[in-house]
Amino acid sequence: MAGMAPEGSQFDAKHYDSKMQELLHQGDNEEFFTSYDEVFESFDDMGLQENLLRGIYAYGFEKPSAIQQRGIVPFCKGLDVIQQAQSGTGKTATFCSGILQQLDYGLVECQSLVLAPTRELAQQIEKVMRALGDYLGVKVHACVGGTSVREDQRILASGVHVVVGTPGRVFDMLRRQSLRPDHIKMFVLDEADEMLSRGFKDQIYDIFQLLPPKIQVGVFSATMPPEALEITRKFMNKPVRILVKRDELTLEGIKQFYVNVEKEDWKLDTLCDLYETLAITQSVIFVNTRRKVDWLTDKMRSRDHTVSATHGDMDQNTRDIIMREFRSGSSRVLITTDLLARGIDVQQVSLVINYDLPTQPENYLHRIGRSGRFGRKGVAINFVTRDDERMLFDIQRFYNVTIEELPANVADLL
């Protein structure tokens, strides 16, 4: 399925790793490094089924993003692919299109398995897959924690083409034999870096052992830490590599500013001063702990500011309702943590506030990547205390960007 290696050829791990690093460091002007050279400027040129094209255009895509121009076709050809691109570049639609193109719709068995690090992201992928496959009659189900096991078993028994899920619940369904792996021919790891940093490595390995041997593998990730390279080496067969240099991982069109806040205690007043500006548009405010989400929400409400909040301790139903209200625009300001950064795909968000700077530079990308998706303009404002100066410096160096002090006319920027 995945373009098997020639008989008897040994896979040279050291050579592969050194090649991978070379790819990451060559050529300053190329947007992507890839061993697959074809670029398709239009969805119509990709040889996709008519009903898949209908779904793509109905979803609102007009022209493929850079990663879609390179990444959809090799996936459709059954090749193993490693695709590295930042949030908001259309990674999800890339692998969804590749999967939808290859399914046998006459066979109502699970043929593709997609793993994601959080429930929110898994449910987001399920929505995109269902929307793009609307005219194909695709059956998709999200297997995630916090939902009924029995309901999962019922839906899987009734037959689905694609399962999207978090590693824990997917492994559980495989172990119970509620999810049968016999017909699975495509396996995708989305946000692989995040899954590994959350300690899902063993579960991913366990799941892989239960899948058929000749399987197509896609790894999608914003960053490529060594553990992600290790996964590609263990599970992938001569993968096509489509990579973005780290310096280009920041998003175009997002203006980034900082506000000097002398002490942690003064952040709240600073946020309240900005509230009128926040409510003009839709905004997401990031803090670093669940407890702080609750604390900040209470403080804002006690000052008569309308905000909604979501974090990992809330039950799934509550989170779904809050996200629905936010997506529909009935709620304008959302307070949350990194856990949910990757699941918030809200088109209207044009302002992100990092009330707390992220604890590692990589997460900065996933937070501000929520504003200005697909070339939309956006503004990110970072609250910086003396203790945060080092992290601000690290973020600027990591992404090769300059973050300037917030001007007085912030409302004009939105």
Curated annotation (Swiss-Prot):
Residues 72-242 form the Helicase ATP-binding domain. Its EC number is 3.6.4.13. SMART domains: DEXDc (SM00487), HELICc (SM00490). PROSITE patterns: DEAD_ATP_HELICASE (PS00039), HELICASE_ATP_BIND_1 (PS51192), HELICASE_CTER (PS51194), Q_MOTIF (PS51195). ATP binds at A85, Q86, S87, G88, T89, G90, K91, T92. Residues 253-414 form the Helicase C-terminal domain. GO terms for cellular component: cytoplasm; cytoplasmic stress granule; nucleus. It catalyses: ATP + H2O = ADP + phosphate + H(+). Its main location: cytoplasm. GO terms for biological process: cytoplasmic translational initiation. A motif (DEAD box) lies at residues 190-193. It is found in: Cytoplasm; Nucleus. One of its GO terms (molecular function) is RNA helicase activity. It comes from the Eukaryota. The keyword Nucleotide-binding applies. Keywords: ATP-binding, Cytoplasm, Helicase, Hydrolase, Initiation factor, Nucleotide-binding, Nucleus, Protein biosynthesis, RNA-binding. A motif (Q motif) lies at residues 41-69. It is an enzyme of class 3 (hydrolase). The keyword Lyase does not apply. PANTHER family: ATP-DEPENDENT RNA HELICASE DBP3. eIF4F is a multi-subunit complex, the composition of which varies with external and internal environmental conditions. It is composed of at least EIF4A, EIF4E and EIF4G. Interacts with DRM2 (via UBA domains). ATP-dependent RNA helicase which is a subunit of the eIF4F complex involved in cap recognition and is required for mRNA binding to ribosome. In the current model of translation initiation, eIF4A unwinds RNA secondary structures in the 5'-UTR of mRNAs which is necessary to allow efficient binding of the small ribosomal subunit, and subsequent scanning for the initiator codon. The Q motif is unique to and characteristic of the DEAD box family of RNA helicases and controls ATP binding and hydrolysis. Belongs to the DEAD box helicase family. eIF4A subfamily. This is Eukaryotic initiation factor 4A-3. It comes from Oryza sativa subsp. japonica (Rice).
